[in-house]
Curated annotation (Swiss-Prot):
GO terms for cellular component: cytosol. It is an enzyme of class 6 (ligase). It catalyses: L-cysteine + L-glutamate + ATP = gamma-L-glutamyl-L-cysteine + ADP + phosphate + H(+). It comes from the Bacteria. NCBIfam families: glu_cys_ligase. This is Glutamate--cysteine ligase. GO terms for molecular function: ATP binding; glutamate-cysteine ligase activity; metal ion binding. Pfam families: Glu_cys_ligase. Its EC number is 6.3.2.2.
Amino acid sequence: MKPFNELVGKLSDAASRQALKSMHRGIEREALRIEKSGHLALDKHPKALGSALMHSRITTDYSESLLEFITPVFEDIDELVEDLTLTHAYSVRHLNGQRLWPVSMPCYLGDAGDIPIADYGSSNTGQMKRLYRKGLTYRYGAQMQIISGVHFNFSVSDQLWNRLYELSDTSLSLEEFISESYFGLIRNYRRLVWVLPYLFGASPALCSTFIQDPKTNEFPFEVIGNGTLYLPYATSLRMSDLGYTNQEQDNLNISYNSLACYLEGMKSAINMPSAKFAKIGVKVDGEYRQLNANILQIENEFYSPIRAKRVAKGNEKPSESLARAGVEYIEVRALDVNPYSAVGIEKSQIRFLDLFLLNCLLQPSPASDASEEAEIAANLQAVVLEGRKPGLKLTRAGEEVSLSGWLESLFGNLNDIAKLLDDEGQDDYQVALAKWQKAVNDPDATLSGQIIKGLKDNQIDHGDWVLQLAEQYHQELKGYPLSEAVTMRYEQDAQASLEKQARLEAEPSVSFDDFLADYFKA
């Protein structure tokens, strides 16, 4: 691949700049439903929001209480955020007095056994989705599963792929070139993934009620107010061992060096038995506890801060879609919910992500080895637990480097891309970049820095602060204008999804045992 500066130079003509700008994006935002008291809502998914199994925009994640709002794919950032906002605005009008919890880490939790697993109805597909979640509960506990995040889906235009293909000296087909380039992006993203929790990590503190596992006492927490625990320099406890972790997966070593390596690694992981999970049992006294006793029940259980994706056809598994036609887009999974936005993410973050991901695509991306993977993991853990610590050092290619120095050089490259994306007389990308550049040498300008400063300055408990935000955003979204036509569209979508689920459940089907056997036979 050509050096970054040379490639940027070759993309500076009008047609290439237009090809660069035509990115496709989608957002998935998770949010817990809570009662006005702040306690987790324990009732069923609201019927006015349709079928969680069939609705394209409003579904549930792990729990019946954990809503997920999904946008279609957009090229225009304003349209993307407007769509996400409309879905929120419609939904809050149908929560029967409940609110949305506007941060990643849950708070007022009673017994973890009361957290309701999502229910998708009586069809075999619906039962399988529920059983998968039941397996997650047995494996990792319910608490970890109701931590929420924001996923950002991203792809570049066909025009850009054609231009990059033309500029390359590859012997690959265009489809192979696209997949290998996306895997190059993924490798560079993993090298730089710590940047996202540094800037956008928004879970440096949590309620003491979340700490029910003795192992979490190993963290040197400090206290604000009555029951807020925090680490002074943390950025994202969601991405630490307190959040999404799976020690069983630590030894999978799935390679991102090519699509073929990735698919081979995933196939082996899916079929790898786990002695630990076998102890849970698969079907005990006639009742299923998990889909199987492998390290991964299904591919979705594999935790990674980024995924290669392709829209599935029919009942294809994710790896089958990728094997059929290569990588279509990538999914960024390292974003905390932004508590300063009613919809969990703001436009300046989206523009930063565009620049960050284009940089990951356009930079040379050598293959990664085990020592670099260890370096990547250590850098990420250092930043999520103490990313705002003055003088923090990370490791790059075996050399010690300061976090701020590494960020300075990255922002220089991002600025080159921002200039290509901003038309004459426009500066949206450069303004967004300048906003986050303040955080390079001022950790208080990061989201986590703003949160800790706010909690300390106001001597307020994290839970009380979040509850105030929940109320504020509820009122804002409730007052957000919804036209009659938009309201009718959401009502029709909800009704159509319920009817679609009813039709599926009415169809003749094989037994659930046979359905599962058939699914895993393929």
